[in-house]
Amino acid sequence: MADIRQENADAAARVLFDAGFNVCTATVDVSSRTSVQALVEAATKLGEVSGVIYAAGVSRSQASPETILKVDLYGTGLVLEEFGNVIARGGAGVVFASQSGHRLGPLTTEQNALLAMTPVEDLLALPMLQLDQIKDSLHAYQISKRGNSLRVMAEAVRWGKRGARVNTISPGIIITALANDKLKGPRGPGYRRMLEVSAAGRAGTPYEVGTVGALLMSPDGAFIT
């Protein structure tokens, strides 16, 4: 269990420990290759890495476009690459993207390929990701989340060569502390409108998202990648 803040990792670990799981914690900055490599090293010292669940990220209301691209896009590519180098045969990964990535307008075939295949260290240098092309934090967030889905599609091939799988989940509005704050804030009417016109007609719960993640990580999801 890793987080950029040790206290967050410890709090989550206590919940799991009280439910009967053995948990180790670490800090990680996903925008730093050195930090991610240290996390991979710590994980491999515990044994085979058979599962990776990645939910790190910052939202448009929390950060600048530069930070969003560095954490949500570059960081995701970095974690996929580094853990993809050690994932065990039969292992699986899940990356939490967002429905926001699917609300971005269509990209060109070339842009899709660049987001999917550009070496991680060259990602943020792409012309399409420069600040004169990124309109605001929402645009940075949407293109990062679109990039997450594209990146996982490409990584699924590489992970597959190791006998492992990787998928993304792009949830809609899920009721968390952050979502409740947004519903009560200035953007609340827009979020409530999204819920009203959605097919489900309501927000989701973390448990409901978790059941999808459990399927993708389990042998029952062995053909899904």
Regions found by a protein language model. Give the residues of each.
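Catalytic loop of short-chain dehydrogenase/reductase
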Residues: 58-62, 89-162, 171-176
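Alpha-helical segment proximal to the catalytic Tyr-Lys
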Residues: 85, 157-158, 222
